[in-house]
Amino acid sequence: EMLFSDARGFSPATAQNTFRVGASDYLDPLFLPQLVAQIKSQAPLCHIEILPLSAALDYRAQLAQGEVDVVIGNWATPPDDLHLGRLFGDEVVSLVATNHPAARRGWDTAAWLETDHIAPTPTHPGAKGVIDDHLDSLGLQRNITARCPHFGLIPAMVASTLLVLTTGRQYCERYVGHLPVTVLPCPIEFPPMMYYQLWH
């Protein structure tokens, strides 16, 4: 809705703008396709560029310079120097292969921390995601034995290994029924993963 705001003097049906959206592939796999479909249905002449959130994308500077229109992501503490809109919250769960021992017998905190985890590659050296930030706040650390920069590939890696992916339920549920994976509750309570849109 922010992209189509009348306050910007914008007529969707005739506009020929290019919308540049910074986003990661860790969103629900249907979120960005639905966003693109909505933009194309309301503004058919507009172009859309999805830019990956990475160390190479200084989203604050690019938002300020008008090089990116909106950034979509999840932050434990979103930046307070930008406009912010909450999109949705999601329960934190773990995705495991259907033959993972925890799928049969469950796990306690110690077993969950010790098992082999897979996580996205940090966007820059020293960066941590919301999962590890929360664990740090509890004085805990999980055993990350694999990292991948392409979040969309991780569920297939989980399906063929004993690796555990911990992220939002909506993301995980998209793969149940398509891959031999199942969703398990985390033995540690996490706050909901909040997804935001940011703009200048």
Model-predicted segments: where are they?
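Alpha-helical linker/hinge and terminal dimerization helices associated
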Residues: E1-P12
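Flexible hinge/capping segments at coil-to-helix
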Residues: P12, P79-H117, H200
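Central regulatory/effector-binding core of bacterial HTH transcription factors
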Residues: A15-P79, C148
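Hydrophobic residues within well-ordered alpha-helices
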Residues: V21, Q62-A64, W112, A156-A159, ...
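A late-sequence structural motif
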Residues: F31, A103-R104, T109-A110, T182-H200
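Secondary-structure junction motif
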Residues: N74, A102-R105, T109, D116-L138, ...
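A ligand-binding cleft/hinge motif common to bilobed small-molecule-binding domains
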Residues: W75-D80, G129, F151-V181
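Short beta-strand->loop
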Residues: H83-V93, L165, R169-E173, G177-P192
